Amino acid sequence: MTADSAVLALVRELIARPSVTPDDVDCQLLLAQRLEHAGFRCETIARGDVTNLWARRGNAGPLVVFAGHTDVVPPGPRDKWDSDPFVPTERDGYLYGRGAADMKSSIAAFVVAAEEFTAAHPGHDGSIALLLTSDEEGPAVDGTVIVCDELRARGEQPDYCIVGEPTSGDVLGDTCKNGRRGSLSGRLTVKGIQGHVAYPHLARNPVHQLAPALAEMAATEWDRGNEYFPPTTFQVSNLRAGTGATNVVPGEAVVLFNFRFSTASTPEGLKQRVHALLDKHGLEYELDWELGGEPFLTPRGPLTDALVAAIRAETGVAAELSTTGGTSDGRFIAKICPQVIEFGPCNATIHKVNERIELASLEPLKNIYRRTLENLLLPR
């Protein structure tokens, strides 16, 4: 079996397992069996309905980790798909199926890359590990974060981590994520006095009180970003008030909002500024906060250089380092690993009907991962 067909065969096996969060459907068991044959020690770290796999080969440093998730989002209406989302289907140069791009192809490519690398260089420097979870697309409370806590408790610290998220845009290799913005959400409840719209002097309209404060929040420059991050953004995601009647002044207004923030801001700093702004407008309010994740950044260095060089050698593409997009499990790994980068296939169809990956990209993806291991773990 050729290397590219080995990747294709494995990703087909993974897609055929309908591993919607948090159900792993033995994806990790399949992978562990292969990794054990390549000399990896495999350990399942389960929590609730979530399955996590930690597989490591070697004991020395540096420790290079590949991180990924075996779970996928629900397929949505199956009648909208041109083929069964859990029957891997090759058509017009693409492989279709839920998880094809996000991120079962990355997992298959790295496993085969690790098999090739360890077979060719059994005495390589350092160690290689895989961290896989079935809880990335869901709450993400019993997945990667639990494994990171366990690794921290026993002093097992990765030096480099590649997260196999689908980061590429137009072509394989054009984008790597060397950081991600943080996510801070708020639920703001502004108190008013319900009443009849014909007697506004007997009521207090929380929407009228909220509007100027909300406008100021939307117009505020929270920071200017920095070399790696765009400026922090503020967005309202939901606004609710009233009973549905046209003649009743609402008794309260509820706003859900979110900051995507850079390393130029901190959660506490953003919270303090929001409270000061609301207090300035004289609002009676309650505000609950939820920190979805802090920003992380890997400056240019050994890991970024190794991956960018591997991409150029395999594809000729000059990869761009970017911090745009949503959060990922990289936010948990960055707390125990000094260098984290995300790289994987094109992301145009992730979470969509007819999710797909170009068949011709599977072997280059595997080769990029293998070349990165060579750049990090072989004498230069």
Swiss-Prot record:
Q: Where is the active site?
A: D71, E136 (proton acceptor)
Binding site residues for Zn(2+) 1: H69, D102, E165
Pfam families recorded for this chain?
Answer: M20_dimer, Peptidase_M20
Would the keyword Glycosyltransferase turn up in this protein's UniProt record?
Answer: no
Q: Which InterPro entries match?
A: Bact_exopeptidase_dim_dom, DapE_proteobac, Peptidase_M20, Peptidase_M20_dimer, Peptidase_M20A
EC identifiers of the protein: 3.5.1.18
Q: Copy the pathway line from the protein's UniProt record.
A: Amino-acid biosynthesis; L-lysine biosynthesis via DAP pathway; LL-2,6-diaminopimelate from (S)-tetrahydrodipicolinate (succinylase route): step 3/3
Q: Where does Zn(2+) 2 bind?
A: D102, E137, H351
**A GO molecular-function annotation:** cobalt ion binding
Q: Name one GO biological process term.
A: diaminopimelate biosynthetic process
Q: Which reaction does it catalyse?
A: N-succinyl-(2S,6S)-2,6-diaminopimelate + H2O = (2S,6S)-2,6-diaminopimelate + succinate
Superkingdom is Bacteria
> Required cofactors, per record?
Zn(2+); Co(2+)
Keyword Lipid metabolism among record annotations: no
Q: How is the cofactor bound?
A: Binds 2 Zn(2+) or Co(2+) ions per subunit.
Q: Which UniProt keywords apply?
A: Amino-acid biosynthesis, Cobalt, Diaminopimelate biosynthesis, Hydrolase, Lysine biosynthesis, Metal-binding, Zinc
Outline what the protein does: Catalyzes the hydrolysis of N-succinyl-L,L-diaminopimelic acid (SDAP), forming succinate and LL-2,6-diaminopimelate (DAP), an intermediate involved in the bacterial biosynthesis of lysine and meso-diaminopimelic acid, an essential component of bacterial cell walls.
- UniProt family annotation: Belongs to the peptidase M20A family. DapE subfamily.
Q: How does it assemble?
A: Homodimer.
Would you tell me the protein name for this molecule?
A: Succinyl-diaminopimelate desuccinylase
Q: What's the gene? A: dapE
